């Protein structure tokens, strides 16, 4: 038995005999900078652990480490019907989740397209729209009405502070939203008021982050799940810590939240290493950071998330073409000069090209960028995409290893979601290999820590958290800070 995990990613077996010595020479420093050794990964993990600890301290640190106020592990025996909503960038998702009590569930969902003006509408327009969609959904599912109020979990993936699980004070809008009168205020009573107006029996019992939802949903179905992870446009992790090991909660919890109580932590660790201490940044990473809307922030995210993979490739290609005059000679580079013109689909398609002459890459550059490529150029493009994808995957596991080592997990299922995890070629195999490199597990044993596909965090996760919260509230237990 060897590993039984994903096999290492296959690199293209092609010769570089037709690639010019000058181009091969230019590739060497890129290969050196983007190849991350096992020793370097272990050093990053060690620093990551100290940053996680700092985030939990009273003084705080780069990583926010936000208590999620989920203080019970799901057992898988939870039952009942729960609503969940997820306010995305283009639609509102409404889900009815029926928890079966045997680590099983059944879902019914609808998506409601957001009107074009909604992201800059008034506060009342937003909440009234959500309430109207909820009423339409509930009336269809329960034409004869509900016998008792439906508990609702609200996935709100915008920066919000919480002193208890059934509140969320919006810090600032992101993702193109800009509605006046909501920032700095608790969104839960606003939604509850709108729901009351339409006369539908719904109680908003929990407001959650999607990563915390991923953690809890996966724990409901998988007793080995220890972590929820997002690898997509953003990166994040969530896990359960213990109240007594969270110094910033010292003296702030009610007496019915004992020191041994578990506490879900939404890490928001895209901000790891904002002080530029450990991550080996290239000049391309520095340029991306300096030209970003928030320089100096989200350092870790900018080196691994899907949003930046294509931009790193674009910057290297532009340097090879414009400064070094090694590729795309005599071509119009106007489209290539547009920042972020190459999204994550570019390196993804480049790595997926199954043809020996990389004809898919040729089509991609011709159709999207107006650039005719030679076969040697395409080999270099492919090699660069592999280097960038490999680096992203290897960095991605550092948060996993750090949390496992911090909590003393020797075995774990780490439940992952997001476009990079689900769609980027080779990502699963590369992350599995990176974990082996960090831990140096024997080759003849099954990998004890593995990344697995997550359950639906914003739907099932929100519902399970609503179930756990409803149980606490019925028992008269606290769901937040002392006095909150």
Curated annotation (Swiss-Prot):
It is found in: Cytoplasm. Pathway: Carbohydrate metabolism; hexose metabolism; Carbohydrate degradation; glycolysis; D-glyceraldehyde 3-phosphate and glycerone phosphate from D-glucose: step 1/4. It is an enzyme of class 2 (transferase). Residues 21-467 form the Hexokinase domain. GO terms for biological process: glucose 6-phosphate metabolic process; glucose metabolic process; glycolytic process; intracellular glucose homeostasis; mannose metabolic process. Pfam families: Hexokinase_1, Hexokinase_2. Its EC number is 2.7.1.1. Keywords: ATP-binding, Cytoplasm, Glycolysis, Kinase, Nucleotide-binding, Transferase. One of its GO terms (cellular component) is mitochondrion. Has antigenic properties. Elicits a specific immune response in systemic candidiasis human patients undergoing malignant hematological disorders. Monomer. This is Hexokinase-2.
